[in-house]
């Protein structure tokens, strides 16, 4: 994968490298959208590793709906098409239950630690006298069911029935064999949820790093964890990975303190939702849940569109509405805020990130989510194309022309997609191609949305047209 190079730096490892600069002005790899990385807590599912979940598959069958899995739910409400899911934590204890058999027992153990509240029922299958069924419940809901042969060595048959289970392990104990009597919702011995520390978030971020994503959100309003996410995004940027973090703190935090938190990031790859307390149709949402929905929206929105004044149909009411001066202050300090449109629908006031100050390599465009998404997409697509040609063409006039042509093709595609005004690829004139190294300039003008519309009204006293 492409990596970052500083001006004047030459690399040891073969590969393609990129550098970002401010464009000098006067004064057939496509986009991958809708991918959200989510760090959360649960009581079931694989712990400390990533599970990639497609939207149509749902997360409930893997992680249930407990803990802070609602972060995934909100990301999907926001439009996420794919989740890079990681249950954070370490330690804990697995729930288990031992069922009596003719002799000995059959022990059923949850594969993962957590306090899920499982119970088990064993009964004759109503439609087949030769079969029994074992049903695992989580709370009052059926979670998993297996069938096994009735009569004979039912204990072994039950163990065999769980052989392909993704959630439970079954084993004989105390020489278990023979019939397994009926039981009704016999409770599992309680487990313990894994403990969660900042170290567990750091581990989860390392796991997530192995996968492509557009945005990332976490299940906490803790500022220390938000800083971990920010540092993580900076680190993977230097390895050619482009992600945007979306966070929110508790609305009980003073307005000025929240402004300071947002301004403290001052970067294009962090989005801070300042008035996160909202009412959905059936529940109150705030903090990480709101940030997760915005993460889904940012990831899913094509880079030729802006989220400014995009209505959020899930939200019915804003619980913390600002004055005009507060909205202006929020935007100036790098906050994303919710407001109402003229139809009293909740929408995003201004789709900006936390960047406040520009520098020698970042212009004003880096303050906007749309333009950051466009630029990240361009760099990703060009980097992948360049990486695909490493070692495949000669470093001569023809080979470099091939590289430039392939890169130009992607630029042209993004122009046609309405994402760029123009983009031109040419060999860099400041560095001379030699041995195995060559350099290219990508001169880009990216598009923006009309977000400030000024109207001049000119009235006259005369009533004659």
Q: Where do the PLM segments sit?
A:
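C-terminal structured domain segments
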Residues: 395-443
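C-terminal edge-of-domain segments
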Residues: 430-465
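A glycine- and small-residue-enriched flexible loop/hinge signal that marks low-structured segments
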Residues: 2-64, 68-392, 403, 418-419, ...
